[in-house]
Swiss-Prot record:
Phosphorylated and activated by DcuS. The keyword Cytoplasm applies. Pfam families: Response_reg. Residues 3-121 form the Response regulatory domain. This is Transcriptional regulatory protein DcuR. It comes from Escherichia coli (strain K12). PROSITE patterns: RESPONSE_REGULATORY. NCBIfam families: PRK10430.1. CDD domains: REC_citrate_TCS. The modification 4-aspartylphosphate is found at residue 56. It comes from the Bacteria. InterPro entries: 2C-system_Tx_regulators (IPR051271), CheY-like_superfamily (IPR011006), Sig_transdc_resp-reg_cit/mal (IPR024187), Sig_transdc_resp-reg_receiver (IPR001789). One of its GO terms (biological process) is phosphorelay signal transduction system. Residues 181-200 bind DNA.
Length: 239
């Protein structure tokens, strides 16, 4: 399992991020910290090694950026993803200078959170896979692309235009409805697993956006809705 530490002084936000982490296979939250002092105690003194840190910038009496040089000088092996409402160029520049692996601006979509963690894991595994790389492999590792990269809107293997058309036609007919994977899968009579693959692709194409809701049991449910500014793209796949 990949051990994640969440640093945020807002208890509700920290809990929400903890639940996000719990939804991604292979990741677990091993602690939360509301102060940098508590965070350093966990990072440097805990028996559990921290693989990934989710770091807020704006804290009540502290600035999360102050932790980055501490980690850098200590040659800490934990990687950092910033999750913050800080969107100014200076803060982002300082964060990147200290090697943060990703930067999410609040509020963010659940799919973007999942992309950040799984993308980081993919690069980490790739770095541990080989001792040497050729240029194409290095390009893929650093840029996430290659010289012959395909159109990101091309359907991945296993997805069919016919099924996509059926899903998009249903979504088009329910433009004002925020739906779950289970609801759509039942309506168009396909498996939940297959339906989720299409929905993830539509989110990656910016046709849909996601939000997360919690029922009385506390179980998170992802819900989807059309992004109005990209409605024309959805209509293309309805033909």
């Amino acid at each position: 399992m990949i051990n994640v530490l969440i640093i945020d002084d807002d208890a509700m936000v920290a809990e929400l991020n903890r639940r996000y982490v719990a939804q991604i296979p292979g990741f677990q939250c091993c602690g939360t910290a509301s102060t940098l002092e508590k965070a350093k105690e966990i990072i440097f003194n805990s028996d559990t090694p921290i693989d990934l840190i989710l770091l807020d910038i704006y804290m009540q009496k502290e600035n999360g950026l102050d932790l980055l040089p501490v980690l850098h000088n200590a040659r800490c092996k934990s990687d950092v993803i910033v999750i913050s409402s800080a969107a100014d160029a200076a803060t982002i520049k300082d964060s990147l200078h200290y090697g943060v692996v990703d930067y999410l601006i609040k509020p963010f979509q659940a799919s973007r959170f999942e992309e950040a963690l799984t993308g980081w894991r993919q690069k980490k595994m790739a770095l541990e896979k080989h001792q040497y790389y050729d240029q194409a492999e290095l390009d893929q590792l650093i840029h996430g692309s290659s010289s012959n990269e395909q159109d990101p809107r091309r359907l991945p293997k296993g997805l069919t235009p016919q099924t996509l058309r059926t899903l998009c036609q249903w979504i088009d007919a329910h433009q004002d409805y925020e739906f779950s994977t289970d609801e759509l899968a039942n309506e168009v009579n396909i498996s939940r697993v297959s339906c989720r693959k299409y929905l993830i692709w539509l989110v990656n194409c910016h046709i849909l956006f996601t939000s997360i809701h919690y029922g009385v049991t506390g179980r998170p449910v992802y819900r989807y809705r059309i992004q109005a500014e990209h409605y024309s793209l959805l209509k293309q796949y309805c033909q």
